[in-house]
Amino acid sequence: MFQREFEFTLPKGYLDSDGNIHRKGVMRLATAIDEISPLRDPRVKSNPAYATIIILARVITRLGALSELSPMVVENFFAQDVSYLQDFYRRINGLENETTVPEDTTNSSEPLVHT
């Protein structure tokens, strides 16, 4: 049986409304629907980078003591944590060795998955 869930620790952590920091979490492997579903979301249609937020909210199954992880929670992650999670997502899903895009055409607002 192969591993489907992976533990991580955020560099900064999510600060909730009560002042609690949540750093330890679990991310599951992404499925095709995790990457396709956000494309139908109006927020992604107006801002393609928002797909990253939706995808992360779908694949993070646990973060600290939070009972639920929605895109609204992911929106409030520190930039360093989002960058860490994007790298972690690519690594566990075997996407880190994809064809590289020339440096002059890269855009930091691109979603996790190139369609």
Model feature map: region roles:
Residues 1-115:
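Short, surface-exposed, charged amphipathic helix/loop patches that serve as local interaction elements
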